[in-house]
Amino acid sequence: MAGRAPGDHASGHSDAALPMSIEIRNESGVSVDEPALAALARHVLDEMRIHPLAELSVLLVDGPTIADLHQRWMGEEGPTDVLAFPMDELRPPPPGSDRTDRVGYTSGDPGPATVLGDVVLCPEVATEQAREAQRPVTDELEMLCTHGILHLLGFDHAEPREHATMFGLQDQLLDSWRTERGPISDAVERDESG
């Protein structure tokens, strides 16, 4: 999985019941259940106790586009599965703290609204990785989206301790998502109209 890099932000709109702004833009040519992906992102942000007015953009792109971004921002050749471009710098809590400390506030005080940034996913790479891992593509996309959001929240996996923390949290978030909400649609097909 790719790391974090600075980047642009695009805001979106969500329904009035859940004011969190999560925009999903699919420019990949691959059909993805975008409302379900937005619901997953909302679940992750809710579980991480992110301010309900936070803004997040998820962009789905094709292989050449993510390869270009990967080279430009990470200095690495070839396509990757996920990139995260944070806007407001957030840092993970110190070891041993609970989730109420995630972004510097305590229970009952949601803290300031923030622009989290952009998560860029490549369904083509996700499909290939899912095939290699012998798991559903939807599971791979869920994992990559969650992974990218955690990068936006300041988590990284360069060091063994960071890796254990980030991937442990990622697994917990995905388990709670699948238990409470169910997986996103298994329909990931090439969009022939575009």
Task: Indicate where each model-derived feature is located.
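An acidic/histidine-cluster motif and surrounding catalytic segment
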Residues: 1-141, 150-194
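Residues within the DNA-recognition helix of helix-turn-helix
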Residues: 144
